[in-house]
Amino acid sequence: VPECRYPKQRGKNTIIKLMSRFRTFIRWAIKNKYMSHYPFVEYEMGTAIFGTPYYLTKDERNTLYKAKFPNNPALEVQRDIFIFQSFIGCRIGDLMKMTKTNIINGAIEYIPRKTKEGRPVTVRVPLSPTAKEIIAKYPDVPGNKLLPFISEQKYNKAIKKMIQLAGIDRVVTTINTITREEEKHPIWEVASSHMARRNLIGNLYREVQDPNLIAKIS
């Protein structure tokens, strides 16, 4: 029997993002004379609202890296990948495509997927001692993959579980994407692969406060 899934309610930010893309397409169609009527004349797009970015502090990151999960060794593998991603700051889609060939002269080099169709930019991130240590743990991953990746969905579930089991339960404030109301959650409950990017950017900004430098490696 096919699985029955009901559509989820979309948040205001998601609707704004989708409608913005649709508006861009409509403008292209009008410019190329595929249509003449512009349907967005009286449509108010609205403004996306985001809460304060949350991320693991250096101490929390180190606590997670040292945590042991004797009853779930597979979780320790995914923990290593999450810590590695927290040092590299790349998006999950870019991370999962990395192989050993992305290691060049003590750094990770890659072209972010989001820049490939516009102006391709090569990002170079020096490997920290911890990042090198993690890579050394997994020398023979099938397909020459950089690390033993699993699906993004399973990875996100593993991230929540590992942070919870490590006892990292600091409460953070988020914005509900549907109601736009403020909510409080333990950080493990709202953690995901995208938080790994914020782990790098947030901690780095505390030290250097140089947006240009941070942009070059994220």
Q: Which stretches of residues belong to each language-model region?
A:
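Short, basic (Lys/Arg/His-rich) helix/loop patches that form interaction surfaces
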Residues: 70-72, 140-145, 160-216
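Short, charged phosphate-coordinating catalytic segments
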Residues: 26-38, 85-107
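Conserved tyrosine-mediated DNA breakage-rejoining catalytic core shared by Y-recombinases
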Residues: 42-50, 88, 97-136
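Catalytic-site neighborhood detector that most strongly recognizes the C-terminal catalytic loop/helix
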Residues: 55, 114-116, 152-155, 218
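Conserved catalytic core of the tyrosine transesterase superfamily
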Residues: 66-83
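Short, leucine-enriched amphipathic alpha-helices that occur as contiguous helical runs
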Residues: 61, 77-79, 156, 194-198, ...
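Residue-level signal for the short linker/turn that defines the boundary of a DNA-recognition helix
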Residues: 10, 79, 90, 208-209
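N-terminal core-binding DNA-recognition domain of tyrosine recombinases/integrases
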Residues: 1-54, 67-71
